[in-house]
């Protein structure tokens, strides 16, 4: 039975990822005053299927000097971790209801760094290695603020369990009392998922394509799927943390509709940001985090520690 539940979660995620690639190309197309893909199927709707067939039927080339095992394991690990991070998300009921769901998600997102590092190192190409080092430095740096922001939100929530966030936000979204955190969280998720304007890992002008430059066909598609699954997952996480939808146990469908709408709007805002902003310089990216975000989040975390105590507000303890 559990395997059926797992499949019922994984298949829709992969479908959502496939169509997110199409939505991205369409949105970017219309923002640049062109049509986007419109040849394969009606309005280009079958484009993701054509892309998948093309990628998975290509020969998976590998460089002669690469270390084979790591080269093959890295993309599989990337996708496996991206899908694992969905398990504790309440939509409205999680696949596995964990006591420390938030901690689990932080741990999984930290492990994702290894797949990037291995892929860059195993490719044995200087471009891939530089791209991987950039990606790792960026991901690890922005995880610091993500963790502190999470801690601040959880101080209002009262536990590390994700479903209690729904109870916490029955009367008010957490974006209202902690909007500076929400803004920094959104920008940090952009950096964490390597999206524009923080897509330094795949700076075409200087690094050709970044850490996945030596990958072709199937393994490349796995990295691609992992990246987009992470984007959707991060937006869903943002919705749960800051824009909690109202959950009526008698009609869980209403929660799902509400929640999916918010997550889709956030995902489209990711694409909007990509179409609007130029790429950051690497030192600007690091300055933004270590000199702007970190002091601010630390100060706000201390404020979130004191605020419930001052107002004698007890978080929901159920």
From Swiss-Prot:
UniProt-recorded Gene Ontology molecular function terms: NADH dehydrogenase (ubiquinone) activity
Domain of life: Eukaryota
Chief site of localization: mitochondrion
Places the protein is found: Mitochondrion inner membrane
Keywords: Electron transport, Membrane, Mitochondrion, Mitochondrion inner membrane, NAD, Respiratory chain, Translocase, Transmembrane, Transmembrane helix, Transport, Ubiquinone
GO cellular component terms given for this protein: mitochondrial inner membrane
GO BP annotations, alphabetical order: mitochondrial electron transport, NADH to ubiquinone; mitochondrial respiratory chain complex I assembly
Membrane protein topology class: Multi-pass membrane protein
EC number of the protein: 7.1.1.2
Segments crossing the lipid bilayer: 2-22, 68-88, 100-120, 146-166, 171-191, 222-242, 253-273, 293-313
Chemical reaction(s) catalysed: a ubiquinone + NADH + 5 H(+)(in) = a ubiquinol + NAD(+) + 4 H(+)(out)
HAMAP family reported in the protein's UniProt record: NDH1_NuoH
Family, as annotated: Belongs to the complex I subunit 1 family.
Quaternary structure annotation from Swiss-Prot or TrEMBL: Core subunit of respiratory chain NADH dehydrogenase (Complex I) which is composed of 45 different subunits.
UniProt function note: Core subunit of the mitochondrial membrane respiratory chain NADH dehydrogenase (Complex I) which catalyzes electron transfer from NADH through the respiratory chain, using ubiquinone as an electron acceptor. Essential for the catalytic activity and assembly of complex I.
Protein name per UniProt: NADH-ubiquinone oxidoreductase chain 1
Species this protein is from: Hipposideros diadema (Diadem leaf-nosed bat)
């Amino acid at each position: 039975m559990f395997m059926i539940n797992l499949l019922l979660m994984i298949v829709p995620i992969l479908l959502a990822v496939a169509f997110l690639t199409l939505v991205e190309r369409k949105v970017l197309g219309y923002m640049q005053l062109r049509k986007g893909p419109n040849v394969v199927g009606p309005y280009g709707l079958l484009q993701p299927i054509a892309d998948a067939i093309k990628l998975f039927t290509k020969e998976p080339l590998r460089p002669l000097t690469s270390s084979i095992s790591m080269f093959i394991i890295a993309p599989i690990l990337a996708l496996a971790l991206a899908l694992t991070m969905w398990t504790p998300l309440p939509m409205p009921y999680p696949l596995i209801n964990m006591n420390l769901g938030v901690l689990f998600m932080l741990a999984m997102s930290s492990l994702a760094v290894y797949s990037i590092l291995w892929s860059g190192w195993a490719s044995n190409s200087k471009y891939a290695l530089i791209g991987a080092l950039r990606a790792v430095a960026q991901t690890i740096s922005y995880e610091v603020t993500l963790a502190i922001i999470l801690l601040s939100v959880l101080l209002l929530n009262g536990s590390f369990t994700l479903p209690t966030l729904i109870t916490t936000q029955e009367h008010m979204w957490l974006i209202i009392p902690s909007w500076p955190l929400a803004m920094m969280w959104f920008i940090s998720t952009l950096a964490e998922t390597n999206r524009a304007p923080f897509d330094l890992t795949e700076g075409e002008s200087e690094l050709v394509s970044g850490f996945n430059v030596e990958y072709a066909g199937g393994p490349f598609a796995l990295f691609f799927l992992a990246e987009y699954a992470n984007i959707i997952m991060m937006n869903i996480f943002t919705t749960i943390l800051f824009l909690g939808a109202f959950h009526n146990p008698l009609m869980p469908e209403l929660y799902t509709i509400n929640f999916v709408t918010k997550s889709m709007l956030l995902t489209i805002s990711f694409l909007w940001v990509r179409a609007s902003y130029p790429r950051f310089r690497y030192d600007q990216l690091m300055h933004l985090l270590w000199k702007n975000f970190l002091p601010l989040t630390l100060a706000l975390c201390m404020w979130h520690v004191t605020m419930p105590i001052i107002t004698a507000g007890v978080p929901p303890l159920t």
